[in-house]
Amino acid sequence: MPRIARLPDIVANKISAGEVVQRPASVVKELLENAIDAGATRITVAIKDAGKELVQVIDNGSGMDEEDALRCVERFATSKISDAEELDALTTLGFRGEALASISTVSHFELRTRRENDNVGIQLRYEGGVLSERGKAASEPGTAVSVRNLFYNVPARRKFLKSNATEFKHIFESVKAQVLAYPEIQWQMINDDETLFDFRSSDMHERLNFFFGDDFAGSLIEVHDDNDFLSLHGYVGKPSMQKRQKNEQFIYLNRRVIQNRMLSQALQQAYGELLVERHSPFVLLFLGIDPQQTDVNVHPAKLEVKFEDERSVRTMFYTIIKRSVRMQDFSPDVGGEGFHETSDSFSSRSSQHSDARLGFQAVPSRASSTDDLYREFQESTPKRPMPDRTRVSEQEEMFSHSADIFCEPDREFRSSDFGQVSEEFVDGVRLEPEEKDPKIWQLHNKYIICQIKTGLMLIDQHVAHERVLYERAVDIMDNNVPNAQQLLFPQKVELKPWEFEIYLEICDDLDRLGFNLGTLGTRTVMIEGVPQDVRSGSEAYILQDMIQEYQQNASKLKLEKRENLAKSYSCRNAIMSGQALSLEDMRSLIDRLFATKMPYVCPHGRPVIIRISLDQLDRMFGRK
């Protein structure tokens, strides 16, 4: 067996480069962090051939003398820390002292630097980590680093680089993350001699609109919270801006871009049912915590972070985001954002982190509160006594006449499904004889149209009722509210083996919800009582459908048990498309919808309400 020997520095640096320099974007990230730590107020990034031919970063920071310039390319040489204790109180982005050594080892590396009071600058050139040229050079104050022919001496690594489009996208995303984190810095980016952007002002809105589209900044919700433990500032997106990928989530810890699974999960849970399955919101959030409470020395890439008190960080992060999001009006406008995925962007720190430096501006809110929209509805409809919202069971009775529509959402509906109709219908719209000007109509037995002060409000009757039933089910299970009605004739249901296993898992919560159930043998369930929302005659179908949907939600969404059950219950018991509603039914549904905590989306993230303003109608008809 060969003797153990210490590796030469050049070999060790090549190995280290595999962790630090994974692709051209890694080079860009490390050079930008050095420029920011040097106190630069203007940074230029120039790229050629997606970083394979050239990565150049020029800054007007503090610069270096010749001794420091030579030392900065050595392995584990840094000005950021001097002893191990300082790792517990880092206020800089860089600190490991290995990036430039790793980069210079796998490229043709050039460094030009000058301090402001020096008459001439220093120029150093390295090939494969070896100093090949050293001398004086005319240069502006600051530092310019040029990395050419990346991985020229590591052909295996160069071979596994992706296409130019993919590599450039990673570079652009890395630059974008820093541009958004430091609005006080002027940023310029050049790709293959073409200027992509040149931000000279600190206007955050200008940058957001450039990267994500016109008027993007105006669609955001501002987050601003400080306490003795942490601060959280920035912006989060409305649910209409959600998308499948998480590449538009920017979370910073003391202005260091980070990736943290715990914070990502807390963010998803804070939005909850506002998000469609497997979608994520846009966020640009700056988390400030005492550096002694964090550990960023987890991986050479410095993206991962650990918190000393992870539970407190998660709880506060979740609470602040939820509070900021939940009181907003998310009813989309026709011709506006709608509920869709946002398009891809352009590329298809403790004491330093004050509000003034971040340059945050108040986002002009385009959303009214829930109470404002409900008030518009009330003012635009005839006066009537307000319903007693404590008499939930009586209100729910209005919808108990729905037929077996729960089990067959796509079936055709007949008037006979709903019994004898006594009210007058005109073009499919039901009118009460005592109401000459109802201001509420039902369209195709599917949507409710309401006149409001500023235009029209359209409501999907199924998902509206789903939202009402969902919140009611959660409240019943959490607070043990009596909700059962006994059956005159108990029903027997034969379950499949897998259905019976799920039944055993959720039977206690089914009991809290209002199901009075018993078992016979190994697969038979006796239904002796059901919740008040369940229509007579559909008890067995409802139970089986709830079990099936619960299983689907559990496998796809990984929900909490009670949340899963509440979603299954509300979906299977809500009135469906095709069911005619009386005027009083519609009014009651609207009243109860606006009494919920989140009336604008159903428990699965779909929109409940859409508004059409008079201004939009005027534009459609050419009046404006």
Curated annotation (Swiss-Prot):
Region: Disordered, residue numbers: 336-357
Gene Ontology molecular function: ATP binding; ATP hydrolysis activity; ATP-dependent DNA damage sensor activity; mismatched DNA binding
Ranges annotated as biased composition (Low complexity): 344-353
SMART domains assigned: DNA_mis_repair (SM01340), MutL_C (SM00853)
Annotated Gene3D superfamilies: 3.30.230.10, Histidine kinase-like ATPase, C-terminal domain (3.30.565.10), MutL, C-terminal domain, dimerisation subdomain (3.30.1540.20), MutL, C-terminal domain, regulatory subdomain (3.30.1370.100)
Top-level lineage group: Bacteria
GO cellular component terms, semicolon-separated: mismatch repair complex
Residues spanning the signal sequence: none
NCBIfam families (alphabetical): mutl
Function: This protein is involved in the repair of mismatches in DNA. It is required for dam-dependent methyl-directed DNA mismatch repair. May act as a 'molecular matchmaker', a protein that promotes the formation of a stable complex between two or more DNA-binding proteins in an ATP-dependent manner without itself being part of a final effector complex.
Family (UniProt): Belongs to the DNA mismatch repair MutL/HexB family.
HAMAP family linked: DNA_mis_repair
PANTHER family, alphabetized: DNA MISMATCH REPAIR PROTEIN MLH, PMS, MUTL, DNA MISMATCH REPAIR PROTEIN MLH1
The protein's name in its UniProt record: DNA mismatch repair protein MutL
Name of the encoding gene: mutL
